A protein has these predicted regions:
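Acidic, low-complexity glycine/serine/threonine-rich segments
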Residues: 1-131
Length: 131
């Protein structure tokens, strides 16, 4: 547009902290289930071509993260008996508000991020525990 100034705002990535307790069905090994869950909740393209839950292509500006979809995804993994989310929050902000509400809301320029990379913990952390 001639004579008009246009300002474009970039995304603001919001790192998440999620702690998930998992009970494993009899006949399955926790280590196998944990490895599968870490893959499923990754930010990578999985060997079978699926995208990990926190792959950047799965989230857009202002899109909330729903607790129910995380639980359903975990329970869909073969060998998972039950799932208990213990922490579901923005990183560094100790609050159970999103856990109680069942969703983490984001602003119009915010995008959820959870890389779970030990070298870059400031990009979100996903922790698995027994039970």
């Amino acid at each position: 547009m001639a004579g008009e100034d246009l300002e474009v705002d970039g995304p603001q990535y919001v790192p998440l902290e999620i702690d998930m307790g998992v009970c494993v069905k009899p006949g399955y090994f926790y280590s196998d289930i944990a490895r599968e869950l870490l893959d499923v909740f990754s930010n990578r393209v999985l060997p079978d071509g699926r995208l990990g839950v926190f792959h950047p292509d799965n989230f857009s500006f202002g899109q909330p993260v729903f607790l129910s979809s995380l639980i359903a995804t975990a329970q869909a993994v073969t060998g998972v008996e039950s799932v208990n989310i213990k922490k579901f929050q923005r990183q560094g902000i100790d609050s159970n508000e999103a856990l109680l509400a069942g969703s983490l809301t984001l602003g119009r320029l915010e995008i959820a991020q959870l890389d779970n990379d030990r070298n870059f913990p400031e990009r979100g952390v996903f922790t698995l525990e027994r039970g």
